[in-house]
């Protein structure tokens, strides 16, 4: 009965909402306009000799989720409406810069916004720049960007992937300077700060954009920056009449409640528990990354989550350290007598992922850890909600870079 209720709730959650509720999303690969159908954002990218489709698809699914694995999201209705209003206003400035500290929910907001728009008449280019999903190099990023733009302009890209990245970059810049075939084009680039062997600069977008072009870029605040000014300057967007900025704020108490409600049965019952919401807000301090981690953990508990009491949370410290203290405590309870044997291998795996400069393949982890294949698989099992990748087509990495700064220890 509970599984049937969960299924119905998730089906309902995938429908666009109006009013003061943020969209509730369980996600559905077969129903996502972003990655399936005749107008998905991967069309054109698959024409490259090296297919980067899986990398971008996995990035999108990380924030949309699937029916058995819904991804917490909510409390962002005002930001979604701001993006809608900017896009729908023909007199709005052509460029929009989205900035915030790490973990504030920029990627989730953009992916959910594009999914919610569902506007088949608006051609969309979406290319994330992500270390975790191996799209941060200039070879991958500019080839994918150029290929997607070429598809929308009805043209072909070169079949030779050996050409210099500058050629792909120049090709993309050329398309962005031309009027779109349908006089409308939305380009969304997430994660400019994660670029590895290149930098986003004043040559990335035209200073005189063609009619109908709208561009959204997202980036984390850099060192000694607390606002959008640094990125506006790097892109040359500080001049009047070219760009507006949007900075994401932490979630409010109401936003945390909305995230719980969006998950459907059984967590929606907790959204009305003022005491539980207050404790989750205290622990997360409104940080969307932490809210997602705690709500993910509650979802895994199923119906037992509804028996959660505020006393169960009051001994925990706010922030990621408090979360990991609870996470280790829960793991030791699950392992029981095997905890002394299981904990060292899990911690060794976490430490390797923390110190790695890029995602690690399975063979890399086996070599560096001196673990057997069985021991490594057992060590990765409890890390499923913290680590992305399969070790083969996509290396293992933390689902968010901030997790690595807290999980390592001696």
Where do the PLM segments sit?
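Long, low-complexity intrinsically disordered regions enriched in small/polar
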Residues: 1-58
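Post-nucleotide-binding-loop coupling segment downstream of the phosphate-binding loop, primarily
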Residues: 99, 104-184, 192-194
């Amino acid at each position: 009965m509970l599984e049937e209720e969960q299924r119905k709730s998730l089906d309902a959650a995938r429908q666009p909402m109006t009013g003061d509720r943020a969209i509730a999303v369980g996600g559905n690969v077969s129903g996502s306009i972003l990655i399936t159908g005749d107008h998905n954002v991967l069309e054109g990218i698959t024409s490259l000799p090296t297919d980067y489709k899986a990398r971008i698809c996995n990035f999108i699914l990380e924030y949309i989720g699937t029916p058995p694995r819904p991804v917490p999201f909510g409390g962002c209705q005002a930001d979604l409406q701001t993006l809608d209003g900017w896009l729908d206003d023909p007199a709005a400035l052509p460029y929009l810069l989205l900035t915030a500290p790490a973990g504030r929910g920029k990627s989730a907001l953009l992916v959910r916004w594009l999914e919610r728009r569902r506007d088949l008449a608006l051609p969309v280019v979406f290319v994330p720049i992500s270390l975790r999903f191996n799209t941060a190099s200039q070879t991958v990023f500019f080839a994918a960007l150029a290929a997607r733009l070429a598809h929308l302009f009805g043209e072909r890209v070169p079949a030779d992937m050996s050409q210099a990245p500058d050629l792909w970059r120049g090709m993309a810049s050329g398309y962005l300077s031309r009027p779109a075939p349908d006089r409308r084009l939305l380009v969304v680039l997430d994660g400019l700060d994660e670029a590895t062997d290149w930098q986003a600069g004043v040559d990335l977008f035209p200073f005189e954009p063609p009619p109908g072009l709208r561009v959204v870029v997202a980036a984390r605040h850099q060192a000694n920056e607390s606002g959008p000014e640094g990125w506006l300057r790097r892109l040359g967007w500080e001049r009047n009449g070219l760009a507006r900025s949007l900075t994401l704020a932490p979630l409010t108490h109401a936003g945390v409640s909305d995230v719980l409600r969006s998950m459907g049965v059984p967590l929606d019952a907790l959204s009305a528990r003022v005491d539980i919401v207050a404790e989750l807000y205290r622990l997360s301090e409104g940080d969307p990354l932490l809210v997602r981690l705690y709500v993910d953990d509650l979802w895994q508990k199923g119906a037992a989550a509804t028996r959660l009491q505020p006393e169960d949370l009051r001994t925990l410290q706010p922030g990621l350290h408090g979360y990991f203290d609870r996470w280790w405590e829960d793991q030791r309870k699950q392992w029981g007598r095997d905890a002394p044997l299981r904990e060292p291998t899990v911690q060794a795996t976490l430490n390797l992922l923390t110190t790695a400069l890029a995602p690690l393949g399975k063979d890399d982890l086996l070599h560096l850890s001196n673990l057997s294949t069985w021991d490594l698989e057992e060590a990765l099992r409890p890390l499923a909600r913290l680590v992305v990748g399969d070790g083969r087509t996509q290396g293992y990495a933390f689902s968010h870079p901030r997790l690595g700064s807290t999980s390592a220890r001696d």
